[in-house]
């Protein structure tokens, strides 16, 4: 395969051996290729900033091996019922005042009931009135539920694939890979932007990481947002004690995601507290251009806002303004015009 070009065609037919060849290139060659692609589609010094709030915490019936919110695991976690609307809106106002352009809300459910969906819709409508983009992660959705969220004004829906189809069963048994793909299809068909990525460092192989990216890049449309999480090990979960991923392997995965999905936002998600500033800077160079802002992500720690602000200043990076988020589209070879 020839080196990546700024005008390279956006593809949906990647083969795993091609992806492994990319991942295995000399580190500097891979980062140069990824950065070249990144510059063709985005301002390399702008990072989209989101804030994430847990609107319902704990007691989830799923058995995801990485998650402290699972009812299957012995974890010290204070369970919380669905938050009142005004508490959610106050958190959204605070996020807006600190520079967030998107407000993400997560509930520890297998899937929302119709009653809970009514309350969630009120949250979407209220946050939209504050001038923020909205994102939800509520578990699996039916096509009808996805359409209702779209009608309420939901901009993004997060539903991660987590890992490769082959490794998936070693992490989760209560929800199938196909269940996840079907929810993504319902979200896309409803006209909601898709946010979908995975978690690295769960004991998977490089091939598993390549297969995860292959699944995402070969969807009929690339996810507008691709969150890449570095496993946060929580005592009491089955994955506590897993050998940590080589940081360079994490950067390689970020770079490969950028090449495979040139017009998508690639987000550094959970696990940034374990990353030195230098590692985050490498990730930004390799094509990461989105972060979660705030001291906590659902139930796991996140770098403080002051730390992120200082890091941005040191790197000459600035938060992406809401009005500037129409940075890239899949149909326009190079720098382009539609919201991503």
Swiss-Prot record:
Question: Could you tell me which residue ranges the Radical SAM core domain spans?
Answer: 45-272
At the top level, the lineage of the source is Bacteria
Q: Give the binding site residues for [2Fe-2S] cluster.
A: 104, 135, 195, 267
Keywords per UniProt: 2Fe-2S, 4Fe-4S, Biotin biosynthesis, Iron, Iron-sulfur, Metal-binding, S-adenosyl-L-methionine, Transferase
Q: Name one Pfam family in it.
A: BATS
EC number(s) reported in the record? 2.8.1.6
Q: Listed GO molecular functions?
A: 2 iron, 2 sulfur cluster binding; 4 iron, 4 sulfur cluster binding; biotin synthase activity; iron ion binding
Task: Relate the assembly described in the record.
Answer: Homodimer.
What does this protein do, in the record's words? Answer: Catalyzes the conversion of dethiobiotin (DTB) to biotin by the insertion of a sulfur atom into dethiobiotin via a radical-based mechanism.
Q: Which PANTHER family match?
A: BIOTIN SYNTHASE, BIOTIN SYNTHASE, MITOCHONDRIAL
UniProt-recorded name of the protein:
Biotin synthase
Q: Which organism is it from?
A: Thioalkalivibrio sulfidiphilus (strain HL-EbGR7)
